Amino acid sequence: MTEVLSPITGSVWKILVEVGSQVNDGDTIVILESMKMEIRVKSPHNGKVMELRVKEGDSILEDDIIAIIEQ
């Protein structure tokens, strides 16, 4: 299982997947907002979303776990 981490401190603007979703390498999982910029967090590999640890509107710190993906 792979932990997908936040690359920045900001807030969760939009979640594009659900638990159980199949994702491909490079698919956008969530969109974060920081200083009025949108940052797309992408899947590091093909797999299944096992857990989402954030919800829309959450404030997050750099390196917080966003999701867990099983290969």
In which residue ranges do the predicted regions lie?
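Short histidine-centered loop motifs in beta-beta connectors
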Residues: 8, 14-18, 22, 51-54
